[in-house]
Amino acid sequence: RTNYKSKFPNQAVDIDLWDDVTFLNKAKLTFKGKITRAAILLLGREESEHFINPAQAKIRWLLKDSAGNDKDYRIEGCPLLLAVDKIYTRIRNLKYRYIKDGTLFPEEIDQYEPFVIREAINNCIAHQDYTKGGRINVIEMEDQLVFTNLGSFIPGSVEKVIRENAPEERYRNQFLANAMFNLKMVDTAGGGIRKMFLYQRERFFPLPDYDLSEDRVKVTITGKVLDIDFARTLARNKELTLDEIILLDKVQKKKPLNEAEEKYLKDRKLIEGRKPNYYISAGIAASLPDSAMKAHYIKTRGFDD
């Protein structure tokens, strides 16, 4: 109820007067008082999972070391409303320090924006193809988080979602998505993925990577600077559009550009070099003024790590 009140503050007084049946109906967790699959996924007890067979209400967190070896794991089940918090607390959100020119005092940021972690997990829950009977995976590596869910990416293109910045016309699990929206778990207004990109931009980190092959969605969030010139460019050029940054992100990741993308970046003198070995222009990534970020990142672990 607290989440629902936060989402709909104008109904706060009425919410306190609703009995449980009324509240669950209003939150779209039940339908005319009857239990739905969405209610079992989000609020059900762990032993209730068999009612939605062959679906699995499971999120697996897996920790890997720098060599790719498994170090630890945890599997959380129903209720997924609470499982998200349990998985989130497992992830080690280390501190990054960056040093500005003209000062000896470092500034610290979290390696990952909390919103990005939660949005990625909740998107997996909302868009998982539960008919395939698979788990949602959260894989934690030294400098990356990987989130996977089964099922195709219905909008077709991540760039399309970001560019349109509007609600999707169709969802795989419409009733579940509505319930999660009402509980403030996801943003069905179409801005969640875009916000993830913007948070990475603010850190000067690589943008989220989406792999839509093999009938699944795999999202990789990188928690470090990959290319110093990319970081310098973002720090110095606040006027760059998100579309331009997405293209520069492809350059730093050595991903191929099509002819239109190449021409666009060359015309604006954002890249140099010859195909396929493009790199970010030295001019746009030139040294920064004192007030801007010096691209010197130091990863540090917390005292309790």
Task: Map each language-model feature to its residues.
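Conserved DxG motif in ATP/Mg2+-binding regions
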Residues: 145-150, 221
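Flexible, glycine-/charge-rich segments associated with ATP-binding catalytic modules
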Residues: 37, 57, 157-159, 165-256, ...
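Conserved C-terminal helix/linker of AAA+ ATPases
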Residues: 51-52, 134-143, 207-220
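Active-site helix-to-loop segments that bind/position phosphate- or nucleotide-bearing substrates
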Residues: 1-134, 140, 148, 153-169, ...
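Acidic-enriched, low-complexity/disordered segments with a strong bias for Aspartate over Glutamate
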Residues: 14-20, 65, 70-72, 85, ...
